Amino acid sequence: MRNERAEGAGPATRDEIEDFAADWYRKLDEHVATADIVPLVLDQGLEFVVPEATLRSRNEFGQWLVGGGGHPGVYNLFFDEVHTVRSVEVPPAGTSVPRVQVKVVVNWQARRWHPPAPRSQWIGFDAFQTWEMVRSPDTGKPVIARYVVDELRPMPGSPPL
């Protein structure tokens, strides 16, 4: 049994953040509906930095996922995705800052197809990320306020992104 703070009280706990990371990547792998993943990022004040864009709202994040606003949609570009969390580093308990800085390393493998190629192409990377998590003002649950892909390190044999 976990010893967690009540939802909405203080900064997110290690257990909450680890559970969040697992759920986050499961949802990305399954290409869940935007309504099921967009609430996991802060709406006002979001900074979501990926190699191809910086997103600043839930609306922009949703467009980045499924297409719109000049984004092709990562759900449209990649398939058979598998994210494997390698590590989640959280500051020690007792930190009283409202934003918790988290270091995440995730292995990401997927396939993509560039028409008119006869076959799809495997890609694989270790993604080194920094997250800042806060509690949602609406739900009290942890959400991503800042998400930065610090490095995408290609696996042996992977073409560049």
Which stretches of residues belong to each language-model region?
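Short, low-complexity N-terminal intrinsically disordered segments enriched in polar/charged residues
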Residues: 1-35, 39-40, 44-48
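Short beta-strand edge/turn micro-motifs at domain boundaries
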Residues: 2, 95-101, 115-161
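Intrinsic-disorder-associated interaction segments
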Residues: 6, 10, 14, 54, ...
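A broad structural signal for short, well-ordered beta-strand segments within beta-sheet-rich domains
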Residues: 12, 16-17, 76, 85, ...
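A solvent-exposed, acidic/Ser-Thr-rich amphipathic alpha-helical stretch
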Residues: 34-35, 39-98
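Short beta-strand segments enriched in hydrophobic/aromatic residues
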Residues: 41-42, 104-110, 148-151
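Soluble ligand-binding/transfer domains with enclosed cavities or grooves
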Residues: 68, 72-95, 104-116, 121, ...
